[in-house]
Amino acid sequence: MKHLWCICVFFLTSCATKGILETHILQGEPGEVDVIVFSSTDCPIANAMAPEIERIHISVQNAGGDLFLVHVWAGRTNIDAQKHADDYGLTMEVIIDTEHELVDSFNATVTPEAVVVLYDEDGTPKVIYQGLVNNLFDSPGNRRDEATQHYVRDAVAAGIKNEAISTSYRAPTGCIIEQKQ
Amino acid sequence: MIEILLATVFAQQEEPRVPTWKQDVHEIILSNCMPCHSSGGAGAFHLLRYEDVAGRASFIVELTRNGVMPPWKVDDSGLPVHHKRGISKEEIETIQRWIDAGKPEGDGAEIAICGGGLVIPDATGHTNPDTPWIIPAESAARWHKGIRDKRTFVLPINNPNPMKVTSLKFSTTAPRAVQMVCFVFDHQGRARMFDGWDPDEPGYEMMGDIGWVPSGAHGKIGPGSGVVSLPHGFHWEVPPNIDVVAETHFRPTGKIEQLSLSVDLFEDAIEGSRAVQEIVSMIRRIVIEADDDAFVATEHLDIPIAVDVIGITPRAGAECSGMNISSTNSEGTKQLLLSYSDWDPHYGETVFFTKPFRVMKGDTITSAWNFNNSDSNPRNPFVPAQFIDLARKTGVANFVLHVAPVQVEQASDLYEWNLSMLRKRQRAVQ
């Protein structure tokens, strides 16, 4: 299990672009579940899952947690992210990981890639699931009409109930995150 | 000493040059990724500037190595076809070496890739732009699963005179959501009747078949293609006031999209141009058990009139995993015409051969469709796999052969034979 680090990133809220740099630290109460989804404003695979990601956000929020959408491509600005959130009806907090600090921390490889975090009794965050959001895409170019397996949804539900998760990692498929040079 | 010097010289000559964006990579992108990955194209993102490509270079290499991009599913084993898309191994390797070298931009003038010029059509049809069809953010089951993520639209051409159509160009306001469009020319107003059933909604929720004519009989476009262009010397005869019926297959993009369509028809028929007809090879019904991953359906057609086959439009659902069509002459010589070893219904555009293939009277056209009704088929719409019993009067799996009779005066005989075959198959399978 990996532990979350405190990371300095740019961030904005979904409805009003603050446009300022702030320090953002992931924190949670014991038993709380947070979700991080690595994404990109123009990755068609991540975008196709936007409604599902928003549904997960609502369910996590209702349980007291948060979902953070992390845009990974360096060319993105707050304005791009705000327009993307508006277009796709996303209401979660959006992070632009310009320097790939979050990408490197979680060894994220593609978008979309999800990380589900459960805070234990003393508030220590632990990754209980990482990988595929669902099985809408078998691989890039191989898309089902609709997803039939909902891995993140299931992991969140299990985390909230503090139940064990059978598979903690599913190799994600999507748009490759270009390595920083 | 001389040997050492020569070895050094040769070693220096064999040292591959480091590729740069300006000298090497932009040309590869230009020839393989345009026009989709530019403004108004179907590509999800632009690949025009250095930053666009450098920011996705590894993804580009993966998709091209895996054959996902450029979109092209036709096997090389059939007849040579026009407008084949495919990036070479050498080109992919060049992009990889460019990545390994740190993606140098190179010296020279700033390079950005630009689009093409303006071509004026002879006739145009479009849906009402004031009432676009709303593509939902996610796929939604409709009144039966067979028409999921499909909508058929009527595009009146209002041509006062008959036309000899040689090509058809498609445009849409939602190019990233539209994956495939199957066209039929309707001169009987049948599609208008279907469209009128729900006057408040643009289009209608049915396949684009018109009578016995399957959707796509007059061309089909897929990812990477927006034009159906008949080979030189052939045309479609189109009567006055034709409607172009556009069975539109869309892929929800995650956000609501407003869909309007238009088609441009072009007349560029030369003197002596031959009218094209459609011979339909098909399986009307399939019955497949759950988990059967190797079900094969075949059909044989004995061609009664010599024809030149200029192209083929394939059609089958996602439960189909592969298909091929071949011709066998009276001496038993078999020629594979078209083959898909990895069929994806969203990539089944019309293909035209670089040279017409002549089928003589009495030759046999054999079609075979492979179905994988198991969970190992990543596109199987029936998940978990379930018993399938599908039937359609225009066929659940087809090859539409675009042909011209060798003897022009036999055109009506060919038409009548094709129609009788379609009726016969409908009676035979209940």
What are these regions (language model features)?
Chain A
Residues E29-P44, V156:
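Short active-site neighborhood of thiol/selenol oxidoreductases, capturing the structured segment around
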Residues L4-L12:
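Sec-dependent N-terminal signal peptides
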